[in-house]
């Protein structure tokens, strides 16, 4: 026996082997058949994973499998278990501490899914800022799904209940199988080419990962990203996620939820419309009242025709007095001159010259009197013209022709609908006014 090697106890050896297995080998994926599956009350699962020539004990602890599909697995099924190797020291048995279980054959699909997810995410296809907003009230809704599946019926019934006025266009496509991705892309391109829809629903019912695999196609994801029409995905159930969900402008948990997401609720919409109509009616009432106040203010600012005529009469009287005063001064001045001339003539006693001067004086007085009459007549004519003009534009002239001004509460009425049966209205005539009661309203 070599003296250089330490002597270990069984426990020490098992502990070293356990440390080596856990720290050096790391995470492994192991495919095999389940056997001896045990589900004790502790919540931990124990089973053996075997192939044709070997087997390994596996432990799947409760804190790891709470969301696992293991409850649906049974003895004899092929799975891929992912976990770390360890050693059960008490018996010296090494085992696999399982962290995840999938059906055999699904490991590659999950790997492809994660690789594509990372690739598209790095290109920014999942970024929220590149996603298009959904229309609030779409006129036409496009549906890309199988025309015979349960999903289309759920969508149509939801749309009919929430927003029956929307037009529906169905773009049929396979949603499962090898040709499904190409058909989904074709339907998406066709909807964009038509340009008739404001939003598209990409949907199918629930299923296994293989059933939903068509929606993990890279080319389909890129077509969703460049679609000019917003795309809402409603694929599978709430726990199902596909690449199409990440790229879509909005991800709904189910086809029914997708139909709900793209439509407004009719009752809520009617309430919004009622509120808008009430606000519009209130705004119109306020506008009309404001215009009525402005009109009344303008009417109050218009000068009374009688007051205007009175002002002109006063001006005319003033001008007449000024004219008479000027003429009187002029006559008196000339009389004084005549008297002076008469005195001078009498002093010289030139009888002939006096007679001639008297004759000239009489003619001058006649001319002055004639000029005064002409000036007075012209002023009277001008005054008459002004009075006629004022009378023509005066509301009083309209009243003189048999018309009347009707008012209610000192506000002029322009239409019969401004009064109601039983109202008391004032009717102003050319001479006097009447207080009347409305007994009938005619259009």
Curated annotation (Swiss-Prot):
The keyword Protein biosynthesis does not apply. It catalyses: Exonucleolytic cleavage in either 5'- to 3'- or 3'- to 5'-direction to yield nucleoside 5'-phosphates. It is found in: Cytoplasm. Its EC number is 3.1.11.6. It comes from the Bacteria. GO terms for biological process: DNA catabolic process. NCBIfam families: xseA. HAMAP family: Exonuc_7_L. Heterooligomer composed of large and small subunits. This is Exodeoxyribonuclease 7 large subunit. It comes from Legionella pneumophila subsp. pneumophila (strain Philadelphia 1 / ATCC 33152 / DSM 7513). The gene is xseA.
């Amino acid at each position: 026996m070599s003296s250089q090697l330490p002597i270990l106890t069984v426990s020490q050896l098992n502990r070293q082997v356990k440390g080596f297995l856990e720290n050096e080998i790391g995470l492994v994926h192991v495919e095999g058949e389940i056997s001896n599956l045990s589900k004790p009350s502790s919540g931990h699962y124990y089973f053996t994973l075997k192939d044709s020539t070997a087997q390994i004990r596996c432990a799947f602890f409760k804190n790891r499998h709470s969301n696992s599909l293991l409850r649906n697995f049974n003895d004899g099924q092929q799975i891929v278990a992912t976990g770390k190797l360890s050693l059960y020291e008490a018996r010296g048995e090494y085992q696999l501490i399982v962290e995840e279980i999938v059906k055999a054959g699904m490991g590659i699909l999950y790997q492809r899914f994660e690789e594509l997810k990372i690739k598209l995410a790095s290109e920014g296809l999942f970024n929220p800022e590149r996603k298009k907003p959904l229309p609030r009230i779409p006129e036409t809704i496009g549906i890309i799904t199988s025309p015979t599946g349960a999903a289309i019926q759920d969508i149509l019934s939801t749309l009919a209940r929430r927003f029956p006025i929307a037009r529906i266009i169905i773009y049929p496509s396979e949603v499962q199988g090898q040709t499904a991705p190409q058909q989904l892309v074709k339907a998406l391109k066709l909807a964009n080419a038509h340009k008739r829809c404001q939003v598209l629903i990409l949907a199918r019912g629930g299923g296994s990962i293989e059933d939903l695999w068509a929606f993990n196609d890279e080319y389909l994801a890129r077509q969703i990203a460049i679609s000019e029409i917003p795309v809402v995905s409603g694929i599978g159930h709430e726990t199902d996620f596909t690449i199409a969900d990440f790229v879509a402008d909005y991800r709904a948990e189910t086809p029914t939820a997708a139909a709900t997401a793209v439509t407004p609720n009719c009752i809520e919409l009617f309430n919004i419309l009622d509120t808008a109509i009430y606000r519009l009616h209130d705004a119109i009432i306020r506008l009309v009242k404001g215009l009525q106040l402005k009109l009344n203010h303008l009417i109050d600012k218009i000068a009374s025709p009688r007051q205007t005529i009175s002002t002109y009469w006063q001006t005319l009287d003033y001008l007449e007095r000024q004219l008479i005063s000027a003429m009187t001064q002029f006559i008196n001045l000339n009389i004084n001159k005549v008297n002076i001339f008469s005195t001078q003539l009498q002093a010289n006693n030139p009888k002939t010259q006096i007679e001639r001067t008297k004759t000239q004086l009489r003619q001058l007085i006649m001319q002055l009197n004639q000029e005064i009459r002409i000036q007075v007549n012209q002023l009277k004519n001008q005054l008459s013209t002004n009075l006629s003009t004022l009378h023509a534009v005066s509301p009083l002239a309209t009243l003189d022709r048999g018309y009347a001004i009707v008012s209610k509460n000192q506000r002029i009425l322009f239409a019969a609908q401004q009064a109601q049966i039983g109202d008391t209205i004032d009717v102003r005539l050319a001479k006097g006014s009447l207080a009347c009661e409305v007994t009938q309203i005619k259009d």
